[in-house]
Structure formats: C-alpha cells, structure tokens
Design a protein with these regions (language model features):
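Glycine-rich phosphate-binding loop of actin/hexokinase-like ATP-binding domains
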Residues: 153-173
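Nucleotide/phosphate-binding catalytic cleft detector across ATP-hydrolyzing
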Residues: 1-157
C-alpha cells in the first residue's frame, strides 16, 4: 500500500499545489448508531453555540471499547421543550434542548495506521503537508457526488469499488 500510495502522491505533489489531504476510512471495524444528548439551555434564554456543544458532548458520553474512537458526530435534528424536528435551533428560546445524532466509530489502530502511511508517503515530497482529517469513505463519496437537496429529500448512495461495495442512506439531510 505504501508503495502504490507513494507513487500516486509523488506524481500529484510534483504537478499540483496541494493544500490539504483528507484520508477516507472504511472496513469491518466501522460501526454506527443513533445517540441522543440533552442539556439545559443556559439562563433559559436563546440556544447558543455552547448549548449545541453541550448537547453534542452529552450524546458522545458513551462507553466504547478501548480500541474504538468516535470518528463522526452527525446531527440529525433537535427538540426544544417538546417541539421536535428542528434542524437549526441556534437563537431559538427554551429551557431544555435535546439533540439526535448518528455516531460513527472506528478502530483507533486503523486510523493511526492510515495516517502513518499517508504521512510517510507525503513526508518526503512536502514537509509542510499534513493529513487534514480522516473521513468515513461513504461520507467522503457523498461530499463529492451528492447535493444538500438530494441528502435532504433522501437518497441511497452505492459506491461500487474494486474490492468492496459501500452503501450510505441519507434522509432528511
């Protein structure tokens, strides 16, 4: 893998100005599930960015095995004082804020090994270039081929690769 990646990257690094590198990750170690978080709205006023962060942290307070980590926290919707289906609660008034999320987890070692491989391959060609982030393969594919409207209306993305086929279903964003 290192050799193939190094050959591909060295060609592009020498021909193009590359500002960032995103690494896609997949495999049977990837898991996803729904989680909810809850927080009181500070001072019983308007929902702030800090309130959103508190709700997300509450949803992330889950028990994972030592070899797993959270890769993505994807917000689905929010509820304020029983009013549900809210996509953007920022600035709305209320007392209690609930958030529904889809969490994606993966093996720490798989992520670390991918990052090491990419760093080794790009390190010789450009000392200032570092991986920006590791992204679930299906999410990376969706960012390049789907519009926000398609994800909102609902779509099934099927990515047929050389060795695997990945499926991602988007509904309500």
């Amino acid at each position: 893998t290192n050799k193939i990646l190094q050959e591909s990257l060295s060609k592009y690094i020498s021909e193009e100005k590359i500002d960032s590198v995103y690494i896609s990750i997949s495999g049977n170690h990837i898991q996803s599930f729904n989680a909810t978080g809850r927080a009181a709205i500070a001072d019983n006023k308007e929902v702030s960015k800090q309130d959103l962060k508190s709700v997300e942290e509450s949803a992330k307070a889950i028990t994972l095995s030592n070899d797993q980590e959270i890769l993505h926290v994807l917000s689905k919707d929010y509820e304020i004082d029983g009013q549900d289906g809210i996509k953007v609660p920022l600035g709305m008034s209320g007392i209690a804020l609930d958030g529904r999320y889809h969490l994606v987890t993966g093996a720490k070692n798989a992520r670390d090994n991918l990052e090491k491989c990419v760093k080794k391959c790009i390190g010789s060609g450009n000392k200032n270039l570092e991986p920006t982030d590791v992204v679930l393969e299906q999410l990376a594919s969706s960012m390049s081929v789907l519009t926000e409207d398609e994800k909102e209306l609902g779509v099934c993305l099927v990515d047929i690769g050389g060795g695997t086929t990945d499926i991602a279903i988007f509904s309500n964003g």
